[in-house]
Amino acid sequence: MVGRRGQDRQIFLDGPYGMMTCVSNVPMNTSERSNGDPRGRPIGVFDSGVGGLTVLHELLVRLPREDFLYLGDTARFPYGERTPEELSRFSAEVTEELAGRGAKLLVVACNSATAAALPALRRRMMETTLGIDVLGVVRPEALRAVAATRSGRIGLLATPTTVASRAYEDAVGAIDPHVTLHAVPCPTLASIIQAGKQFDERAVQTVREVCAPLKRADVDTVILGCTHYPLIQPMLQRMLGPGVTLVSSGAALARQVEHALSTRDLQNPQSGEGEYRFLCTGDTEVFEQAGTRFLQMPLGPVERVELATVEVMA
């Protein structure tokens, strides 16, 4: 099913396992679900592909009464080597779609998009009459990593765009300026993981190569700076060693979302389990096949959407 294409809009930006109910791909009637109460509206979550489902999994476990609407921009996956300008525009288009479908809070479950566009997305959404908060994955991971390190040497595995943004350096430095971050760009790792094929020796060698600089730097904590990476956490742990703490964003971000809902009095008052639904911009069958592996829950039907074009202006 193809979602309705909205009118072109201008957006002004200036910077960088519990079970729930999975419903069909019939568009959620937000006013009917909430009866005018914003607490009954869904939480919007997005990623360039299915990696963000590792974050959604933690949200479903932590917040079982909430409704969720997940959008995977699979037609433009991967985001990891896109320019900051492209990521700002893509993120604006996705958040416009989710906000237009009634999201009460937005979660950027993509490290590259968080690094490039979170401040501007947050500012714009909070300045509109909607007052929608936008949360990302970088700061929760940075906080956990700084708390976990014993030596003050932290590693980062992330896409080239995320590494180049220095978003993690800034976040870690703001928390503890005495901590050193060793960042390693991984240009192909997310695509290898999303493809879902059996890891061959070449793929294993790719993982071994990105781990090598972190072993030489003698880090004791490693941030998994892409939401795809938790799926190969056992392999990463084996190659980095049992003494290295691996930090991913899902659980920490879920706690932050819970806090934001409580602070804004937006917790869903329903007594039963919430609903979760899925949208994607690419092939729905491919999304369903890969998504089940990432979410570790049934997906049900996926709705294909065509995003409205937006103009991102400084």
Region locations from a protein language model:
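Methionine residue identity
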Residues: 1, 19-20
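Short, low-complexity, intrinsically disordered N-terminal modules
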Residues: 2-5, 27
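Non-catalytic structural scaffold of enzyme domains
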Residues: 12, 22-314
